[in-house]
Amino acid sequence: MKIQSLGYILVETKDLSAWDHYGQEVCGFMKHPDFSDEEKLCLKIDYEPFRFMVQNGPEEKFLLAGLELGDASALNDAKKIFDELNINYQQLSADDLFTRQITDGISFNDPAGNLIELYHGRLNDETKFTSPKGISGFVTKDLGFGHVVYAALNIEETHDFYINVLGFGDSDIMNLQMSPNPEDPKMKLYFMHCDNKRHHTVAIMQSPTPPSGLVHTMVEVKTIDEVGEALDRAINNDIHISSSLGRHMNDKMVSFYMQTPGGFDLEFGYDGDQPDWSKHQTTSSPAPSYWGHVFTCLLYTSPSPRDRVR
């Protein structure tokens, strides 16, 4: 199976206005004028109809991620693989297909319980992306819109599913000491790539799933100034900054983390690595970052969290 990229995420909220303000005034996303209405907010960051869809509901939580396949044949092949392995999946309804602006798709759960959609054929959108905050553009196209990081207590089973069923490859593996006590067990993280040059499209960390349903997602801009300006906007709008500016060791991304209205984090970055997979060997980074990325807290990631992670 060859998954091309991360196409979109869906989020549930009790307060669309909070997401509207956050998406436009802090992140610089564009509210799609045609697909947004009183029940949902579609946030556009490039040529696609949207990358974030936020819909009214009883909770504040991440719902699902949509992973893109190349064509109808690839989707049919995925169904055959699932059938052979007795993996349950559901066909997306006509309403779902229209709402997501896709041609066809299915949904299923990974072994950690995360809801995923596989789809093909994103419909064309004639509405040009114009950032309300003057962002020159987000790094997307063949790379997809970014990445998602899930929590998975059954990390080895979940990792095996992504590698051997969905066809991902390992980019980097971390084993981090989260507690000041060196005798405490380390936390494992797998960073996995699909069929594009983004360093990782999905990552999983060995921890309980947070109440928000997701650890974080990521978007990438084209200049370091646009990262700094987003950080200023977040601070000026009283957004919780989950991590200071820093450069990651594995994907070289310069970024900061801020909390979304849904409770999960958004990494806002620049200059992510784009490996040549024909030459890449899986790395084992000894630390999350070369510098910076001081986290204000480590919720849901360790029984003995510390205030700073270097």
Regions found by a protein language model. Give the residues of each.
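Single conserved hydrophobic/aromatic residue that forms the stacking wall/gate
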Residues: 300-310
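N-terminal beta-strand motif that seeds the catalytic metal site of vicinal oxygen chelate
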Residues: 1-17, 62-67, 124-157, 169-171, ...
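Intrinsic, low-complexity N-terminal interaction/targeting segments
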Residues: 126, 196, 200-204
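Core segments of cupin and vicinal oxygen chelate
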Residues: 1-50, 150-199
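A structural feature that tracks compact, well-ordered secondary-structure segments
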Residues: 22, 53-57, 66, 119, ...
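Catalytic cores of nucleotide-enabled group-transfer and carboxylate-activating enzymes in metabolic
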Residues: 12, 19, 50, 54-60, ...
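Vicinal oxygen chelate
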Residues: 84-144, 188-193, 238-302
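Conserved active-site tyrosine of GNAT-family acetyltransferases
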Residues: 19-24, 82, 113, 158, ...
